[in-house]
């Protein structure tokens, strides 16, 4: 059967299109460097030009274009609107393309960007050396002296001036006499000495100003014949179209305002003059040449005519003394000068200005007369254009790997395998690419995917985008009172609802703000996609592992973390634990009366049909060992019970509650006598639950009772007997009066977890110590911290994940009131609550309210104490879908707020920062309240300038399933700490630097630019003993990857350092593009695997260096997200607050705001959803 379109099958019976769909564009820059870009066959010249512009950090692309040698060895400018490959295949002598200036300005002072002036300088120097601009001997010597000063600096840096003889100083083939050449070179050497102290930008500016006054500046001519058949050269210049006769006659210039029309017919090019009724014709070599000259002149005419007023009236003063600094990232502010539209060289259609003849688009057309999109398309979104250039072409490239389709995943167009010539460099504070990620180039470690892979990613992205449109608002909770009332009625503090972007008191000391919206109508709305994510599919193995996440064997996982394995989750159902009430708990306690009224109505109108409960409690009391019971205390800093919706083992039967819990002496209960809440077991009891165990309840405020925060004082744990229950053993009835209070002076250490109890070291059971030592997620420095040895670590079961009860660490917000006042003194707090006392409720009555809500109203929190003999039990891990539901539920019900507030921001003890507080180190700290702990700080080899070896950086080590994750968290380097920063990189063997900020945000410096800018002079910068060179840079949408070479000047050793900068973090809040942030984490993983594969396998893997501004906020987000994703990949227990607490014990205040903490949840949810789609 014949194939369509005339396709022929090979003997392999396969047809591969990948080899025919790509183009490797080899482009020579003005500094004679070659770069290569892998594009699709449909990629236009404009896309290639923009790739070069990104590579050079060039914003003013107006003046530049690409050209090639045709088969007659003549220069021809590329038609930017047409596919580049077709033009090269049809006309080019070789596939090499050249970058250069196509439009010259009357004065180089009009150029806004320094890199533009530098490229202009290279172009003009090239014109002089190639003889395109004729000059005299004196002019050549003068220009050569300026060029040497600009290129090589002051003469006293060199032993002699003999090196000048090795470089081309004069036009090629111009000076044949060796004696004259030597004399001219000596004069250049004298001028070089004369220009001592002149900076490179100054010398370049003087060079360009000298050239722009010379004849031939901005001219481009082509051979032709006039009407008499005489040989002439015709071309365009600044003033108009010139004609130069080769017989010695004076040149003739037809000024732009005198030309009424231009046309071409066959091999003739004609000018129609406005003041004369005549047409002047010129004959060219052939029809193609005539058409090309016509297109070029039309473009020049339109460009200069529209620029005439602007260029003459513009009063832009460029300071020639402004130094080109590799560390300066701020760009000149936009001037009122408006660029004209790109000139049009058309093949078809009509020129709408004064011309009527047909023409073709060589440059990007623009009907509005403004040259805006050629600049803004590279650095900002075209909001008014809806992501399209004004001629209708889509912003993204038509390349194979950046598919020009609406999809959430877009792979950047890969480049050749040479890592030294990759990339684009567009990282600036005001440069946030939004739509155009067309010709970006990935680094060498990410190879080009084949055609099938690209198509799979395309299809996957479309499916994912479709699924992403669904929201969580379909939960059947609309009938509850809180959801049917306006937000101002439901939430107790409208100022939080109305001003969610303002900084919270908890974050008032830092430049971050609280941006989590408590009043969002959709608890977890999917963010609007602002741009396609480039590089999001670069590491498929990172997310593919999620497919088998639940199949991983777990005999060695959490052996000592004992808990009851939760049953599988049922199908989706309406909310199950009064989210309308739980939302109130996480706003504030400063206005309890408002909360009381809202909760009162919510409880009063709560009906069974509004929230049908499909889940019941598996366990509501804690089995206590004798040693555990001996040290049990009750904390009444109000733990909020967020009850798991994944436990179905028990059904609530009965509840009793003492009228005054604080006044009742502690009494023990047996296994069969459970106070407050009765449970009917539907699962087989474990053998470890023997009669000698005791059950105790943690008194914690429920949704309704978290109206007033009590004090930090601790009172006895109350044990109550249910009437009619079996009598407990005598030994269990004995009261333990010694347990009423904490020992005086005992510090309270609150850890993230459902149970926080501080005990003397001698009373910690061995099993609990083993649990601390063998936790799957633990810090390697944990055992070195004495204060942690006295803590009972919380259980890390999946049920704990859904338990919102964790103590608040914000003690300044707690009111010191005994719990007896809460339970007995305020009888009218919530009228809808059952009366306190020994009243019993039947099963039917309890069922009306529901077990989850009823247990919450009684202050119960799900938590298990690990038993010594339960260490062998291994629980079944939840699937990705279940984990995703759990995380979404926590966000939806607002549990994250109190969860975050209970995590200590810094150590309570053993947190000395003596070295950081030394007077000589004060200037090395960006913020005086963010300091590294002495025991985990990065210690440098002391130097004369830094005799303490101090840098504001901390080691962070976390072990996940036996794999150690090693980080260094540090602040953004200051100008005076760049040398220390690179010394740390060298001594610690850093291979990857993850930067999560821009150099400047909102006019404030976030990090000094410590690496050289690509395109700057020699791409190098030196800090002390280290020389840093930028080899390449590639922009991938929301992040940029830069390859750096680091050389130790004393030893000559060299290393490669990867710099990964996330560029999409807003000044306030957190990124909305979750997949973009995930693609950044995947890029870190890709580079980490690449560096580890090339390093010595016997040496330990180097730590990942992460920094933002202070080195705690965004830095903590990156580290916490990576570790939690690793837990998901290894099917470990997901306990985000406990891991964050571990991190904060090694560097204070990591994940600085609630907004950032919530962002980590959203990232994990997005990760689970993405892994589910693969």
Curated annotation (Swiss-Prot):
Query: Domain FERM spans what residues?
Result: 23-308
Indicate where this protein is primarily found. Answer: cytoplasm
Cited InterPro entries? Band_41_domain, FERM/acyl-CoA-bd_prot_sf, FERM_2, FERM_central, FERM_CS, FERM_domain, FERM_N, FERM_PH-like_C
- Compositionally skewed regions (Acidic residues) per UniProt: 712-722
EC number, as in UniProt: 3.1.3.48
Q: Record the organism.
A: Homo sapiens
Instruction: Identify this protein by name.
Output: Tyrosine-protein phosphatase non-receptor type 21
The Gene Ontology CC terms held by the record are: cytoplasm; cytoskeleton
| Name of a matching Pfam family | FERM_C
Q: Which reaction does it catalyse?
A: O-phospho-L-tyrosyl-[protein] + H2O = L-tyrosyl-[protein] + phosphate
| CDD domains xrefs | FERM_B-lobe (cd14473), FERM_C_PTPN14_PTPN21 (cd13188), FERM_F1_PTPN21 (cd17192)
Q: Which UniProt keywords apply?
A: Cytoplasm, Cytoskeleton, Hydrolase, Phosphoprotein, Protein phosphatase
